[in-house]
């Protein structure tokens, strides 16, 4: 461990020289650029809510709030709305998407020298979350986290974000409560850490004991779309459903992105 990460404490480590990360935002922008270069008719539409999916013999039509799009083949990779769009398309789906927010901290400039690579703990197979880790980003920033807390809004990136519909759907689904009851202590600890920088730091110190309160600052948050079974089981692999002219990516676990 010390050879690669002098500030990390641990019993043993596995060095993986081929690991890496990607900037998904830049990758997506590049894909759009390439598509438009291949075909000038390629179009990117943002902010258009999908109201319905109309079935046809040879093609399907996506009905948006202001526009319609007809295509022989549709690919839905909708993340936090994947289950709802699948049902609009007529997919018979028992599982439901539940959102879990992950908060990150960043290392301050004075502490960045303490992380040289990507540092991960040994994951606990009893939980669907990896645990806090250190990630050196493509822009040189270093993220620490995330935690994992149930969010009361599917796109709830803020700690106090709330949606009646999303909360009702999640809390009236039996699988949600089975997940809660089987991971009660874990869930409570995660919520405590979400509102306490000191507790978050204590977890980070499990890997790098020399970190102090001055070494970390609040960073971004993300929401994981967790496909949850009726038995409370988390689906830890890809779930792709083929339905007529459509392909639905219902579950895209880490390190996937939507």
PLM feature spans:
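Helical element adjacent to the flavin cofactor pocket in flavoenzyme catalytic cores
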Residues: 14-73, 77, 84, 258
């Amino acid at each position: 461990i010390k050879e690669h990460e002098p500030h990390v404490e641990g019993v043993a480590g596995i060095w993986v020289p081929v690991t890496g990360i990607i900037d998904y935002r830049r990758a997506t922008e590049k894909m759009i650029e390439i598509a438009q270069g291949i075909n000038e008719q390629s179009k990117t539409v943002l902010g258009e809510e999908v109201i319905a999916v109309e079935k046809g013999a040879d093609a399907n039509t996506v009905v948006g709030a202001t526009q319609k799009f007809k295509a022989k083949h549709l690919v839905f990779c909708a993340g936090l709305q994947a289950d709802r769009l699948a049902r609009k398309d007529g997919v018979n789906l028992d599982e439901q998407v539940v959102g879990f927010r992950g908060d990150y901290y960043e290392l301050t400039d004075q502490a960045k020298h303490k992380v040289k690579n990507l540092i991960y703990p040994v994951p606990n197979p009893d939980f669907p979350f990896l645990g806090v880790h250190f990630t050196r980003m493509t822009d040189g920033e270093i993220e620490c986290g995330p935690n994992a807390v149930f969010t009361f809004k599917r796109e709830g990136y803020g700690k106090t974000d709330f949606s009646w519909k999303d909360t009702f759907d999640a809390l009236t689904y039996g699988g949600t409560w089975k997940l809660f009851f089987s991971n009660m202590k874990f869930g409570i600890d995660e919520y405590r850490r979400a509102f306490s920088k000191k507790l978050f730091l204590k977890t980070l110190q499990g890997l790098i004991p020399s970190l102090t309160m001055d070494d970390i600052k609040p960073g971004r948050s993300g929401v994981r779309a967790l496909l949850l079974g009726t038995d409370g089981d988390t689906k830890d692999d890809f779930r792709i459903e083929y339905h007529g002219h459509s392909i639905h990516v219902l579950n895209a676990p880490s390190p996937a992105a939507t």
